[in-house]
Amino acid sequence: MNSIIVAIDGPAGSGKSTIAKIIAKKFNFTYIDTGAMYRMITLYLLENNIDFDDLKEIEKVLNTVNLDMQGDKFYLNNVDVTTKIREKRINENVSKVASIKIVRSNLVDLQRKVSNNKNVILDGRDVGTVIFPNAQVKIFLIASPEERARRRYNEFLEKKTEITYDEVLKSIKERDYIDSTRDESPFVKADDAIELDSTNLTIDDVVNFISKEIEKVK
């Protein structure tokens, strides 16, 4: 039987990573967090003071840096950066890094490579449009900016990060704009993706809906 690819695309704070992890566990699929890869590159560039316009230096980084994912843990050059890649400074810069052409092309190749011959579920911005346009299940998971900001704000509160709801909402809207207007793989819904608005849905509601779609292609 051919391997199954499930693509969940959605804006920041739509709940796609939470949902993807649950479904991966439920179906025993490999979960690939494409956004975490961009976050790790963003972290490396920031910590090494590399300008986002310095394409030669960024290319060197892409050719030498080691990204590894083991379950819920993320490793950058063998160092656990799971917590660091969720920091406010990463949230504020990851969309800029993700809009750099050489970064996207390099990571798309890596995402395809690690997904090869496996049942996988990936979440991101361009999984169903660019990485795997032939994915058997494509979900476009959305929610209102206010609801997404509320979710992110609560995450920050749990981590005791000092930030206001209004700051989170502003950041969400800025990321939406950058993601949807960038030249390289802009964030758009795939023609054959199922749009699911999670604003007023529980996690279980969303998981059950997507699970039914997966059962149809098994």
Segments the model singles out, each with a brief description of its role:
Residues V6-I8:
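Hydrophobic anchor at the beta1->P-loop junction of P-loop NTPases
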Residues I85, R89-V94, A98-K159:
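ATP-dependent NMP and nucleoside kinases share a basic, alpha-helical "lid"
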Residues K26-K88:
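N-terminal phosphate/diphosphate-binding loop that engages ATP/GTP or pyrophosphate donors
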Residues K16:
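Conserved lysine of the Walker
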Residues P11:
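P-loop (Walker A) phosphate-binding loop of NTP-binding proteins
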Residues I19:
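Hydrophobic positions on the alpha1 helix immediately C-terminal to the Walker A/P-loop
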Residues V61, Q70-G71, Q111-K118, R125, ...:
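Small-molecule kinase domains that catalyze NTP-dependent phosphoryl transfer to phosphate-bearing small molecules
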Residues G35, N78, L107, I121, ...:
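Residue-level signal for inorganic ion chemistry
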